[in-house]
Swiss-Prot record:
UniProt organism field: Synechocystis sp. (strain ATCC 27184 / PCC 6803 / Kazusa)
Name of this protein: Serine/threonine-protein kinase B
Superkingdom assignment: Bacteria
Function: Protein kinase required for cell motility, but not for phototaxis.
First-tier enzyme category under EC: transferase
Residues of the Pentapeptide repeat domain: 454-493, 504-543
């Protein structure tokens, strides 16, 4: 079926074999390449469609967001266009993160604007709770360790999402990771001060203020800050714990705060974390995602392989000493849908196994059978002197780890030495295509950019021109990228031990959570590179330009620098 995007079309559904709507004569192929297949969601200011990109082999599915201001007022149209261009610029900037949909295209057609994004198959957290029941305390902590690094990344790009809610968090079916969607309400901190017309700027901002109940007071007053996303994340935690929307939770008549604590039973320490996330006053709320993670005193989802970040030798993690949760009171899992169901298809979801395993980190993870999930792999190497299985909670449909029809199995291997751990990590890699420099460059020349999770050990790409490659979580141990062009490359969570980046152009590359032990970055261009939480122990930055790189002094203490190294923020050599 083809679907007409004309908002005034009386019969938008059309057969597959036509290119012009039979009812209104409107073209069914946007920009000459996107064949619209169906409506995913709509609102007063636009609609979202599923489409097939007929210009690419295999006609891959994508998401087309239409912004359709129905007005003759040139000022309103101009503001709508600014909103469209703002979202396009933001998506282009933050879409480099593997858990944010990539922007594929954007264009204007007949006074309507279109954004084309990567299609993410899976269920959102709102659907997950409605189908499978509420989360345990441990599962909500796991959620926080995954969503907070995403927020930390988009905030580092000077972007406030402004619409964090369960409906905008999809658990990707292919790997069970959360993907943050719908940047339609973003507030670009850089561009927000460029408009001299205050009334027009206010009207433009008012188009997309967020979702009532999830947006904090300062955001409703058109003055969002980074901590506004922290508040919305806290409200999302409440929904995961209770199944209740903010409208279903009473407010204190004197303070205006949500009276949520009577609806849940969690440890006092975790309750304090949520309480501070939900502070109405920005002054008393957590200011950043990292502050929340520090308060949780538990490793992030990605930290299983990043324990070498500390200056001490590799050791088994110890527990955080959290009080155990005593249970979760069930909320109404059939609460009405408050969010836009826009960018996803329906997919089958396996029933949830409500059992959970308590590790000595204080994290309780939900488990199912028979394969181990990526979420569980992040914590499976943590030594646990005793493993307790929590009794099944009284959930509406049983429990599950996530959507997508993938089963799981929790394993508890013995702790490894560092060398054994590295060997085991390579042995546990899924079977993937065997790569060498020739096959890699051939695939790149044909348009391939996604090399995530691939086994690229020892690959030689010296002097290669491969900007924009995605090597997220790939194994690149002993690879050679000397003098390569790697602008905007994504090496997030990649294994990069002893990799040669000597003289390479790595400007605006992402190395979040990567293992760069012993890597050679001498003379490399590292302007705008993000090394957040990367392990730089023994990495050589002699003569490298770190002037605008995001890296902490603590990380650099573990690395090698010399007098020719341009240090962060200084603009001058050491």
């Amino acid at each position: 079926m083809s679907f007409c995007v004309n908002p005034n079309c009386p019969h938008p559904k059309n057969p597959n074999n036509v290119q012009v709507c039979q009812a209104c004569g409107n073209s069914l192929r946007l920009n000459g390449r996107y064949q619209t297949l169906g409506l995913l969601g709509k609102g007063g200011f636009g609609a979202t469609f599923a489409a097939a990109d007929v210009a690419l082999p295999g006609t891959p599915i994508c998401v087309v967001k239409q912004l359709r201001p129905q007005t003759d007022d040139p000022n309103v149209f101009r503001m709508a266009k600014e909103l469209f261009e703002r979202e396009a610029q933001t998506l282009g900037r933050v879409g480099n993160h593997p858990q944010v949909p990539r922007l594929l295209d954007y264009f204007e057609d007949d006074h309507q604007f279109y954004l084309v994004q990567e299609y993410v198959k899976g269920h959102n957290l709102h659907q997950e709770v409605k189908k499978n029941g509420t989360f345990t305390e441990g599962s909500v902590k796991q959620f926080l360790t995954e969503i907070l690094p995403i927020l930390d990344y988009i905030h580092s790009q000077k972007v406030i999402h402004r619409d964090i809610k369960p409906a905008n968090l999809i658990r990707r079916q292919t790997d069970q990771k959360l993907v943050l969607i719908d940047f339609g309400a973003v507030k670009n901190q850089i561009d927000s001060v460029l408009s001299s017309n205050t009334s027009a700027q206010t009207a433009l901002t008012a188009f997309a203020v967020g979702t009532a109940g999830f947006a904090p007071p300062e955001q409703m007053a058109m003055r969002p800050v980074y901590a506004s996303d922290i508040y919305a994340t806290g409200v999302t935690c409440l929904y995961l714990l209770t199944g209740k929307t903010p409208k279903e939770i009473d407010c204190n008549s004197q303070t205006g705060e949500m009276d949520w604590e009577k609806h849940v039973t969690v440890s006092s320490k975790f309750a304090e974390v949520i309480r501070k996330m939900l502070e109405l006053s920005v002054r008393h709320r957590y200011k950043s995602a990292q502050q929340v993670l520090d308060a949780l005193e538990m490793p992030t989802y990605e930290d299983g392989m990043m324990q070498g970040m500390v200056s001490t030798p590799f050791t088994t993690l110890t527990g955080a000493g959290d009080e155990p949760a005593t249970g979760i009171r069930m909320g109404n899992s059939s609460s009405p849908d408050y969010g836009d169901p826009s960018t996803r298809f329906n997919t089958n979801v396996q029933p949830r196994d409500p059992s959970s395993t308590s590790l000595n980190t204080g994290i309780k993870t939900r488990t199912a059978k028979p394969r181990q999930s990526p979420r569980d792999r992040a914590t499976s190497n943590i030594e646990s002197p005793t493993t307790r299985v929590r009794p099944a909670s009284n959930m509406a449909d049983g429990g599950s780890v996530g959507a997508g029809g993938i089963d799981y199995n929790m394993v508890n291997p013995k702790p490894f030495s560092r060398r054994e751990e590295e060997k085991q990590a390579i042995a546990n890699q899924p079977e993937t295509k065997r790569w060498n420099g020739k096959t890699f460059l051939a695939e790149y020349a044909q348009g391939k950019r996604d090399f995530a999770d691939q086994n690229l050990v020892g690959i030689v790409l010296a002097k290669a021109f491969v900007p924009g490659i995605n090597c997220y979580q790939a194994n690149l141990t002993n690879a050679n990228f000397e003098q390569a062009e790697l602008t905007r490359a994504d090496f997030g969570k990649a294994r990069l031990k002893n990799v040669i980046f000597k003289g390479a152009n790595l400007s605006d590359a992402y190395f979040g959570y990567a293992d760069l032990r012993g890597a050679d970055l001498r003379g490399a261009n590292l302007n705008g590179v993000n090394f957040k939480y990367a392990n730089l122990q023994g990495a050589n930055f002699s003569g490298a330009d770190l002037g605008s790189a995001k890296v902490s002094p603590e990380q650099l203490k573990l690395a090698k620098t010399n007098w020719r190294t341009v240090m962060p923020g200084s603009g001058r050599r050491r």
